[in-house]
Amino acid sequence: MADSGNWEGRCSGWFNVEAIVERKTGDAIPADENYDGDDTEDSEMGDFIDNAHISNIYSQQEIAQALYHSQQVNADNEAIRVLKRKFAGSAGSSPDSKRHELKHKQRSPHILTIRDTNTTSTHLLCEEQDSGYGNTEVETYERQVPGPGGCLQSTSSSNNGSQMASPGETNSGSSSISNMDIDMESTPITDITNILKSSNVKATLLAKFKEVYGLSYMELVRPYKSDKTQCQDWVCAVFGVAPSLAESLKSLLTQYCLYIHLQCLTCSWGIIVLLLARFKCNKNRLTVQKLLHGLLNVTQEYMLIEPPRLRSTPCALYWYRTSLSNISETVGEVPEWIKRQTVVQHSLEDCQFDLSQMVQWAFDNDITNDCEIAYKYALLASEDSNAAAFLKSNAQAKYVKDCGTMCRHYKAAERKQMTMSQWITHRCDLIDDGGNWKHIVQFLRYQQVEFVPFLIALKQFLKGIPKQNCIVIYGPPDTGKSHFGMSLMQFMQGVVISYVNSNSHFWLSPLADAKMALLDDATPACWTYIDRYLRNALDGNPMCLDRKHKHLLQIKCPPLLITSNTNPKADDTWKYLHSRMKVFTFSNPFPFDSNGNPLYQLTNENWKAFFTKTWSKLDLTEDDDKENDGDTVQTFKCVSGRNPRTV
């Protein structure tokens, strides 16, 4: 320290510093006092004081607090993780719901196994009545854990993951984690039983259904493997339905169903609902599950949904007899598959399959393809008893093949016995009115084709006069040649032959049963083939036709229309064909409107109007007594008359 002499010289300064230290904060400093904020000497005196150990103490305390805080955070996170793992599959909103489940064990023990993870379904059967005070912030529950020596001890836990520690316990993070893991050391017997029961939920539900209803659920249904397969009728068994919802289910389903058959029986699980429903439209299993889940508040895992057995008489009798008893409620008209197997009149209508009825149906509807016959006739099973008998038969493929063969034979014979005038009249009767014949005439004029010469050629063409039996339409591409020819073939129901099949001996076999034919896009190679082998066909004289697996057939070639980009009369190579055909030239591109539609509509209705308008010009015969005597062609009938069956 400084000597005493120096201190005596600065005696007043010493007191000033001491006065400043004792003055209260905020007091004004007199102006006559000399105060310097940077007291260098005082700072020099401070260097004599060693305060390093005080800083070390403070830093150690801060490190300890940070370590303690991190340990507490880790312990809290671990406690929350354990609680989440324990209560992840709980159906209640808090651990207190376990006490409610044990309380209602006798009424619905399935709640111990059924865990609904949907948080929105909070109004289940075991919901506790609200006391009016609301739920407490911290909900605790007691559970028994094995203590030392195998004794059971009661522990308390809260929903925030904290443990109630004893006075002797410490607050370290490791002890908290060990306390939270105690619940994993024991597995009650009831949990093991629930796991065994829930390992096959469907088997458990089927066993309970058979115990309650006295019959197997699978005896009433035919299982669908896919959840996307659609059906109109469904048999649903729903487990654990609330009584109030079970009573109102019939009224809730009325807006979705045409027929409802509802049964409700009570067991130890609650109410089991058995439902036979015919919906207004086809639905798949997933759609029905979502509908019932929304109406009954039952998870989809505890529903059995399958379509019913439609051809089982015992199943039909079960639904019919239970509908008459007081254990079921029905709404709507009974499905026809139940009536057919239970009502006397419907039973009498079941008969053996008659092939003649199937052939008559195919002939009347002009169906000759085997695939169309099989599909469309099967659709009539719900309306036609013979179609239902067809579906029950084990020889459906044979019946379809025989029906198609006979129908084609009958159609071919019908065409052969008709003249060209009768055939055109027959085709016109099948087409609606309302056509405009001017479209065809205007299109011919647009292509610079004289209408009168074309009409004369068409008259001779339809009559099949020798040397006038073939019409050729020649022109550049995209002039509407094929469109004109195809529209005429569609109206006349003619056939189309293709030169691409000329390597086969049977490529001309469609001409055997045709009233008119079209050879589209004849190339020079095709004209060479016609010049070599088909001169008689163009003449309209009889020719010999080879058919597959059949003897040779002698026929007169039907009127043949040919379209080509090559003019056969311009080449002397085919000079022998010049006198056998009538050539018309289409020189202008086919016209379209601004929307891309054809400007001239060559439809069946317009062709009907064209033939009706030019009937006399084409020299087609007309039946004068048609109104009095009816059609000259007899109506085909292959089904013999029979007396109605009476009871």
UniProtKB/Swiss-Prot annotation:
Gene Ontology biological process: DNA replication
Q: Which GO terms describe its molecular function?
A: ATP binding; ATP hydrolysis activity; DNA binding; DNA helicase activity
Region (Disordered), start-end ranges: 89-116, 141-180, 622-647
Q: Which reaction does it catalyse?
A: Couples ATP hydrolysis with the unwinding of duplex DNA by translocating in the 3'-5' direction; ATP + H2O = ADP + phosphate + H(+)
Name the major location: host cell
User: Where on this protein does the Glycyl lysine isopeptide (Lys-Gly) (interchain with G-Cter in SUMO) crosslink form?
Assistant: K556
Q: What is its EC number?
A: 5.6.2.4
Q: Which family is it part of?
A: Belongs to the papillomaviridae E1 protein family.
According to the UniProt record, list the residues that bear Phosphoserine.
S90, S94, S108, S121
Task: Show the InterPro entries listed in the entry.
Answer: Helicase_SF3_DNA-vir, P-loop_NTPase, PPV_DNA_helicase_E1_C, PPV_DNA_helicase_E1_N, PPV_E1_DBD, PPV_E1_DBD_sf, Rep_E1_papillomaV, Znf_lg_T-Ag_D1_dom_sf
UniProt's post-translational modification comment states: Phosphorylated.
List ligand-binding residues for ATP. Answer: G475, P476, P477, D478, T479, G480, K481, S482
Q: Where is the composition biased (Polar residues)?
A: 152-179, 631-647
Broadest EC class?
Answer: isomerase
Region named DNA-binding region = 184-350
Please give the organism. Human papillomavirus type 34
Keywords, A to Z, come to: ATP-binding, DNA replication, DNA-binding, Early protein, Helicase, Host nucleus, Hydrolase, Isomerase, Isopeptide bond, Nucleotide-binding, Phosphoprotein, Ubl conjugation
Protein name, entry field: Replication protein E1
Q: Does the keyword Magnesium apply?
A: no
Location in the cell reads:
Host nucleus
